[in-house]
């Protein structure tokens, strides 16, 4: 079911979300949450979404990136749920992308993040998995996982002159790489 997106200013986006238990993964509530996340992500046009963004303060985020996306980056990550994720920074060299967020509609901001990360998480069955990622996918992972810890991309913009409305971004900003 498509849910309304919680926007910046809603306190749920500023809380650390609750870890879930393995028993929870067997519940109807969990299955429904996954459907709601996917429906809401697709409807609102995101490449990832975290549970707090649809009003559920649980440590669950989903990401789906296939082929060349509209940001000109080729990344392949089939629909994946990251449950109770932990992030490890493998290469602290930073890279910057213009980011956007369903919870901060109409804006774009240039954010520098670690170039390479390793995420350890539970899959849908509660089995531990890990994923190493670099480049654009590393940024997407950091953006989505930040949502589980009360952080928005705007918090990570170092130079606020690089925060722009979408229309002005389209008109004045040369860099094409950005994410929703
Ligand atoms: Zn976001």
Roles of regions detected by a PLM:
Residues 1-180:
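Positively charged
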């Amino acid at each position: 079911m498509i849910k309304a997106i919680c926007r910046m200013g809603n306190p749920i986006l500023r809380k650390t979300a609750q870890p879930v238990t393995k028993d929870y993964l067997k519940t109807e509530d969990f299955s429904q949450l996954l459907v709601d996340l996917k429906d809401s992500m697709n409807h609102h046009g995101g490449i990832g979404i975290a549970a707090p963004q649809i009003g559920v303060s649980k440590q669950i985020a989903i990401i789906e990136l296939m082929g060349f996306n509209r940001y000109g980056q080729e990344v392949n990550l089939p629909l994946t749920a990251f449950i109770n994720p932990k992030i490890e920074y493998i290469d602290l060299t930073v890279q910057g992308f213009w980011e956007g967020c369903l919870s901060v509609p109409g804006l774009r901001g240039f954010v520098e993040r670690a170039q390479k990360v390793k995420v350890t998480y539970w899959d849908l069955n509660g089995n531990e998995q890990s994923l190493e990622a670099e480049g654009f996918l590393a940024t997407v992972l950091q953006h989505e996982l930040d949502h589980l810890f009360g952080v928005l991309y705007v918090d990570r913009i170092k130079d606020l002159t690089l925060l722009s409305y979408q229309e002005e971004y389209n008109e004045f900003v040369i860099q094409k790489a950005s994410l929703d």
